[in-house]
Amino acid sequence: MEKNIQDFIDLIKKKNSNEPEFIQAVTEVAETVIPFIEKNKQYQSDKLLERMAEPERVTMFRVPWTDDSGQVQVNRGYRIQMNSAIGPYKGGLRFHPSVNLSILKFLAFEQVFKNSLTTLPMGGGKGGADFDPKGKSDREVMRFCQSFMVELQRVIGADTDVPAGDIGVGGREIGYLFGYYKKLRNEFTGILTGKGRSYGGSLIRPEATGYGNVYFAQNMLKTRDQKIKGKTVVISGSGNVAQYAAEKILQLGGKVVTMSDSGGYIHDADGIDEAKLEFIMDLKNNKRGRISEYVEQYPSATYHAGERPWSVKCDIALPCATQNELNGDEAKTLVSNGCICVSEGANMPSTPDAVEHFVDSKILFAPGKASNAGGVATSGLEMSQNSMRYSWTSEEVDNKLHSIMNDIHEACVTYGTQEDGFVDYVKGANIAGFVKVADAMLAQGIV
């Protein structure tokens, strides 16, 4: 079995030699799914996992735009259409200088499993550009988004591929993208999710990834007769996911003591309460400032430049920033400091060494493909509402989100429970996500 796993990983490395993030994501899945395939004959034909690791389509394109000084700038755009076995491609757009083929393929591959776990009919995809919205004027962002959509509109559609936001793509960018699609195609359809409420967006969509992550952590804690109430929580990031994860933690009686951005992290031992969180939301969403400004408003807090928050003592850790932000040494520090639960809000924020240590330590650890699936689940609910030309209330959407996260947790427990009763959520999420897609691929033939 070990040889089969290694042979598969070697094949992936050979075909994708300059794509470390993609290789990392596929390796993590292969280590748990290949042993499952070996025990289940129906999945041994047709090279299912190998086909899942090969995108159905990759589109790469030039994005020229003009800045405010009249200079022409050129960026590179992408759309990875990974797998459509269970529904139209679904996955976010990321605008960040680090964006490349490896990162987007890893995100698209993860998205296939994540979307499968939601039980909604959505395939997996991802896209973006190496454009940095930071420091750009609204008009510059608009011109970039319009140029980006000129090419993207060729490959998306309400029943083909429905993108959403991700890092660097929030409500402003989605609005510009949607507006230009409408102008180019002369049609008002649900080709993007994360839209504003006034033009087809869903209530709870902005909150969904953060809320869903906390709901998943809540479910894990219940398996050990624990609650969020009274727990100290360390959160990384200060964007959409981190903000609403913090909001839900506060609603459930937890104490949030850190948030961060690419410059460093703030530690507020007194706790980030509702008023302080409101300040952070305004700072990040409206003023587009840096988290370091928090300590100017609240001097009792400390700012740690160039550092990550994992040395801060806590009961629960929610990594909500970006991939590979939590390494093996930091995982050891968290566990030795008494952390009992880690629930990933970002995509693959823990390195393989960190994941291995969490699982070996038998703490509660949720991989992002399960714990942050609330965002895409609510995107799926937005697609449903767009199709019906109807809107559900906040309570209805939140109840559906809560139910979906409960179902994902249940699926992880079903496939991840070990002989000693310990739940390996990594194994559970990978196998549960694989089974639905594999069944659909087997039914549809070699395509």
Language model features: what each stretch is:
Residues 20-23, 41-46, 119, 156-165, ...:
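Flexible, glycine/charged-enriched surface loops at secondary-structure junctions
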Residues 193-196, 201-313:
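Glycine-rich phosphate/diphosphate-binding loop of Rossmann-like nucleotide-binding domains
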